[in-house]
Design a protein with these regions (language model features):
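N-terminal amphipathic/basic-hydrophobic helices that include classical n-h-c signal peptides
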Residues: 1-30
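Phosphate-/nucleic-acid-contacting segments
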Residues: 15-18, 23, 197-263
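Cyclic nucleotide-binding regulatory module and flanking cytosolic helices
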Residues: 22, 26-71, 115-116, 120-122
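Cyclic nucleotide-binding regulatory domains
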Residues: 48, 73-136
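Cyclic-nucleotide recognition modules
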Residues: 56-57, 108-166, 170
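Short loop/turn motifs at secondary-structure junctions and domain boundaries
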Residues: 58-59, 75-79, 202
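Alpha-helix/helix-capping structural signal
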Residues: 90, 145-146, 167, 215, ...
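Polybasic "coupling" helices that flank or enter modular domains
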Residues: 152-222
């Protein structure tokens, strides 16, 4: 799984990662080989690395693997047993749940250096959602038994996960209210602002740095694709946004905030 070679002043980790997951077209396994130093691991997962002792860092590094996913590839499926803590190093990921009639609801989106896929393990249950890559992604995977051992030994690390779960719960509560109590215009405006806050904008300071399909934007906003297309068109007519294919430029953010607030 992981081969470790010791040097005088540093440790190099040769990571061989093979992760098998189900997709509509069968199973996909991606083999990744990558050399990582302790400094590179520390840069990849700073929040996790910082509170650890030297011996704990060595133990974590020996169980640290890198995984790459293609665009639209499934990362984990609903009903699967959680095995790893995941941290997104590059790319964009959606957490979603399939609903009635084949429609999906995007529950949340993951940004760089964000940890996910661990709540179900703590709850001793299988995944109640699924995850997939919006675009090519690189992630680190750490076996959950390793995380549990470190938490039992390190109170600061335990507090880190308590804070993370608390923040995630707060975001989930806010999203639930927004998606169930707001009308279509308010939901779509909230989603556009949510994407800006999560992924930021490009150099022009207006264009969202994530290019979602109309279907994904609809699934994020709890509406049909046709409603998302129609509402986006209305926003463009009202000069709130500019649409260029999948690129969306926010022109009047203050009015979008008002629409989102009014609901």
């Amino acid at each position: 799984y992981v081969h470790t070679t010791f040097f005088k002043d540093k440790i190099k980790f040769l990571n061989f990662s093979s992760y098998l997951c189900a997709t509509k077209h069968g199973f996909i396994a991606v083999m990744v080989k990558k050399e990582l130093t302790e400094a590179e691991i520390a840069e990849s997962i700073p929040d996790l690395w910082q509170p650890l002792t030297e011996s704990q860092r060595e133990f974590l590094a020996q169980n640290f693997t890198i995984q790459k996913y293609k665009k639209n590839e499934t990362i984990y499926c609903e009903g699967e047993t959680p095995m790893h803590l995941m941290c997104l190093l590059s790319g964009k990921v959606k957490i979603y749940k399939d609903g009635v009639g084949g429609r999906s609801q995007i529950i949340r989106v993951i940004k760089n250096k964000e940890y996910f896929a661990y709540r179900a393990y703590f709850a001793e249950e299988n995944f109640v959602t699924a995850a997939a890559a919006f675009e090519p992604c690189t992630m680190c995977l750490i076996p959950m038994p390793v995380i549990i051992k470190l938490i039992q030994e390190n109170a600061d690390l335990a507090m880190f996960f308590i804070r993370q779960l608390s923040k995630d719960l707060g975001i989930s509560d806010e999203r639930t209210v927004n998606l169930t109590q707001k009308h279509i215009r308010g939901r779509l405006a909230e989603s556009l602002l949510f994407l800006k806050d999560t992924y930021g904008v490009e150099e022009d300071q207006c264009t969202l740095s994530i290019y979602l399909s109309r279907e994904d934007l609809a699934n994020l906003s709890n509406m049909t694709t046709s409603n998302a297309i129609r509402t986006l068109s209305n926003f463009a007519t009202e000069k709130l946004i500019i649409i260029d294919g999948r690129k969306i430029k926010l022109i009047d953010e203050e009015r979008l905030k008002k629409i989102s607030k009014i609901g």
